Amino acid sequence: MVSDAEIKRINELVKKSREEGLTEEEKLEQKALRQKYIDAVKLSLRANLDSIRYVEDLEENKPKQ
């Protein structure tokens, strides 16, 4: 998971890149932090999607009376 400090750093780098530009080292740091954030979002989304159950599937699995 991405920490609040890492999200804050991502935002700092975005602001700095807009105002004055980034050094090569900062660009690499920004790229790594962004990728970590994207991976965390994908993982969270996958977990949410995997937990979805369709109503039709639940109805089919009920015992028939």
Swiss-Prot record:
It is found in: Cytoplasm. Keywords: Cytoplasm. Signal peptide: none annotated. The keyword Transcription does not apply. GO terms for cellular component: cytoplasm. PANTHER family: UPF0291 PROTEIN CBO2609/CLC_2481, UPF0291 PROTEIN YNZC. This is UPF0291 protein BBR47_33060. It comes from Brevibacillus brevis (strain 47 / JCM 6285 / NBRC 100599). The lineage of its organism: Bacteria, Bacillati, Bacillota, Bacilli, Bacillales.
